[in-house]
Curated annotation (Swiss-Prot):
E.C. designation(s): 5.4.99.9
Stated name of the protein: UDP-galactopyranose mutase
Residues binding FAD: 18, 38, 46, 61, 63, 242, 327, 447, 456-458, 461
Residues at which NADH binds: 68, 91, 93, 419, 447, 457
Xref: InterPro entries: FAD/NAD-bd_sf
Effect of residue 327 to K: Lowers the catalytic efficiency
Positions bound to NADPH: 68, 91, 93, 104, 203, 315, 317, 419, 447, 457, 460
Organism: Aspergillus fumigatus (Neosartorya fumigata)
Record note on biotechnological use: The UDP-galactopyranose mutase appears to be an appealing adjunct therapeutic target in combination with other drugs against A.fumigatus. Galactofuranose is absent in humans yet is an essential component of bacterial and fungal cell walls and a cell surface virulence factor in protozoan parasites. Thus, inhibition of galactofuranose biosynthesis is a valid strategy for developing new antimicrobials.
Length: 510
């Protein structure tokens, strides 16, 4: 057997949040030799940011930085240490329903709806509350969970149509163990009180406040984190593209023919791609049981000041079929640097109603922007040719844009692997796939590496990498991967970027 060109103790494939988490921890421990490779020149993976020619920024989806982990905060604060690197926002979100903006969470604010809809919703909630008292089995599907928690009124008005738009899979085909803290259970007494008094209920959930980077979008965070790693241990771009993983002799082949030998492998590529790269037919067969949806990210840059009807809304949910998108993010509200300066002159491309502008002469701003997400799967196809126009029409239909609004920039990008779907078959497949890989010294981790949506946010993904390294180096239990509800229900403060061992090492060196 020929020797590999490069040999390391731990090889990390992928420089998204998970791979960077693994690399940060390896660099901190300063024990095993390591290297990180990625086929993109720019690190960030699914948490990167694009810039349109006109100067509008769009994240690859509706990212916000909410953290369950002190270690994650430490790493971000180290990468972007200045106060003016960040903006902090209150979560202000609404559901568009029956021509109204209903504050989120929808199920706590049905007092905003027309009276007959209120009756249907409360009727269903009373039935659900009575059922819950006598139920002695857990719900088997997401659909059963919805009906049991909220009743058929809210299920039909919001939860079923909205979740089909998000997941591109019917709720009857999804399991419900993933839910944890992600959906607010309604309080029947509070809802009834609010309906009678005509009140609305306030913020709920983990992202009630969140911070967002001032410059460079979400992608700017991960570029900054990657910049804290030693350059000689990174290999990004074409020269870092993995074409083959030979699990038997523990080598990875890159596109330029370079081979890297490893003792342990942390792979953050989608596990279905990993199985293909390994040419392991048994694993390929098992990964076929995993379902995912694709995500279309659509951006629309608009001339003018942000209208009052939009105000300081952050993100908005759309369960109805008068628009293709399930979520809109007012991306210009997150940072003034997410769009061009008002003094920049841009021509009008079209009006929101699709008509041509009277003049195509470049004019000054100011500008604001909307980012939209549309899901796609075999069960919910999307027409690529018309999706942008359909979304702009949807913005007019939902009164997000006026027909005469001037559009100065558009953006559309499709991400094949967008959401790892928590289908009924998921755990049966994962509980075979992940241990089989681990037996071969491969830790497959990340949003699509370990395929668990409930630990697929940026903070979770980062910690999946950190914890994989701790497991490799000293056998520590991977809490995030194995106990999602546990980590999501507490402040995880035990692990820090500067720990005791490093403090002692520093004092010795002095």
């Amino acid at each position: 057997m020929t020797h590999p060109d490069i040999s390391v103790d731990v090889l990390v494939i992928g420089a998204g949040p998970t791979g960077l988490g693994a690399a940060k921890r390896l660099n901190q421990i300063d024990g095993p030799s390591w290297m990180i490779v990625d086929s993109n020149e720019t690190p960030g993976g699914l948490a990167s940011t694009d810039v349109t020619p006109e100067g509008f920024l769009y994240d690859v989806g509706g990212h916000v930085i909410f953290s369950h982990y002190k270690y994650f905060d430490d790493c971000l604060d180290e990468a972007l240490p200045k106060e003016d690197d960040w903006y902090t926002h209150q979560r202000i979100s609404y559901v568009r329903c029956q021509g109204q903006w209903v504050p989120y969470p929808f199920q706590n604010n049905i007092s905003m709806l027309p009276k007959e809809e209120q009756v249907k919703c409360i009727d269903g909630m009373i039935d659900a509350a009575l059922e819950a008292r006598v139920a002695n089995t857990k719900p088997k599907t997401f659909d059963e969970w919805i009906v049991r928690m909220m009743g058929t009124g809210i299920a039909d008005l919001f939860m079923r149509p909205y979740n089909f738009k998000v997941w591109a899979v019917p709720t009857t085909k999804m399991q419900c163990a993933w839910l944890g803290e992600r959906v607010a259970a309604p309080n029947l007494k509070a809802v009834t009180t609010n309906v009678i008094l005509g009140k609305t209920a306030g913020n709920w959930g983990p992202n009630a406040t969140f911070r967002f980077p001032a410059r460079g979008g979400t992608g700017g965070i991960w570029i900054a984190v990657a910049n804290t790693l030693p350059k000689e241990k990174t290999r990004f771009g074409e020269k870092g593209k993995v074409t083959k993983v030979n699990a038997n002799n523990k080598t990875v082949t890159l596109q330029d023919g370079t081979t890297i030998g490893y003792k342990k492998l942390v792979s953050t590529m989608a596990v279905d791609f990993l199985a293909e790269a390994m040419n392991d037919q048994e694993l390929v067969g098992l990964t076929k049981q995993l379902f995912y949806s694709s995500t279309h990210v659509i951006g629309v840059g608009v001339r003018g000041s942000r209208p009052e009807r939009i105000g300081d809304k952050c993100w908005l949910y759309f369960p109805e079929d008068n628009c293709p998108f399930y979520r809109a993010t007012i991306f210009s509200n997150y940072s003034p640097y997410n769009q061009p300066e008002a003094s920049k002159k841009l021509p009008t491309m079209q009006l929101a109603d699709g008509s041509r502008p009277q003049s195509t002469e470049a004019k000054e701003g100011p500008y604001w922007s909307i980012m939209l997400e549309v899901s796609e799967s075999s069960m919910k196809p999307v027409n690529q040719e018309t999706i942008l126009a359909d979304c702009i029409q949807g913005l007019v239909n939902t009164e997000m844009l006026k027909p005469t609004d001037e559009i100065v920039s558009t953006y559309h990008r499709r991400f094949d692997h967008g959401y790892p779907t928590p289908t009924l078959e998921r755990e049966g497949a994962l509980t075979q796939i992940l241990p089989k890989l681990q037996d071969k010294d491969i830790w497959s981790r990340g949003r699509f590496g370990s395929w668990r949506y409930e630990v697929g946010n940026q903070d979770h993904s980062f910690m999946l990498g950190v914890e994989a390294v701790d497991n490799i180096v000293n056998g520590a239990v991977e809490l995030t991967l194995n106990y999602p509800d546990f980590v999501n229900g507490r402040q995880n403060t035990e692990r820090r970027l500067v720990d005791g061992a490093q403090v002692f090492a520093k004092s010795k060196a002095q």
